[in-house]
Amino acid sequence: MVLSEPGLYPLAASSGVVSGSAIAGGAEKESLEDLKARILARKRNPPQGGNEADYERFGEGLSHVSQAWARRPDGGPGSLAIWFLNAEGEIPVQSEIDQYMDHLHSRRLLGLRDIQINAPVDVPLNITVDLDPDTVDLRERVTASIKAMLKERSRPGLPPKRPGLADDDFILSRSWISEAISTVVGEDSHVLALPAGDLTYSVGRMPLTVNVSFV
């Protein structure tokens, strides 16, 4: 480890050795696409003194949180429910949920009495594609494209935006999957056998595990 500006710390050694086990926390280097998505989300949802987007940002500022979704179950300022994925885009474990809870308690507004931090329920997504041309390389790139689309578009189903409204289910459009396949360079044509139609995910449920089969 080397100080980038030794002149700012005249009493500190300019270099040192740190073992890997002594370094904790942190996250992998952010990709340009993830940075772009975060900046656009900030522009679309400027800080508003404790709205749902603010609490999503509070969580996404943690090293072990990649995405978060907040909703006020009763439509008022007194309660908040949050679902999130860890840094790997996977279901968080209890210790990660506890860290998120502690972090939000340190930043919550006084009127917020009840906070629920939830792990989404993974509903595996099974996809069957008849691909032309059908090569190993094209299969791999099609699978990667589908997973990238889901990372960008998918979310858990959420409670109603306001009392009296229906639940805000997440609807995965079949056309999104077909589009993700069609955009892969080298794909000439395909038939999407499964899913046969749009898929609906209720509160707390979302597609994370993706199984792509080729016929």
State what each model feature region is.
Residues 44-170:
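Carbohydrate-recognition loop of C-type lectin domains
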Residues 3, 16-17, 81, 116, ...:
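Generic structural signal for residues positioned in beta-strands
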Residues 11-12, 16-30, 64-72, 205-213:
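Short N-terminal helix-initiation segments at or just after the protein's N-terminus
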Residues 5, 9-12, 119, 123, ...:
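Intrinsic-disorder/low-complexity coil detector
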Residues 7-18, 109-120, 190:
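Conserved short beta-strand edge segments in small beta-sheet-based binding/regulatory domains
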Residues 1-3, 25-32, 76-78, 106, ...:
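Glycine-centered flexibility motif
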Residues 1-45, 49-50:
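Catalytic P-loop NTP-binding/switch module of NTPases
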Residues 143-215:
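An aromatic-glycine-centered, glycine-rich loop/turn in mixed alpha/beta architecture
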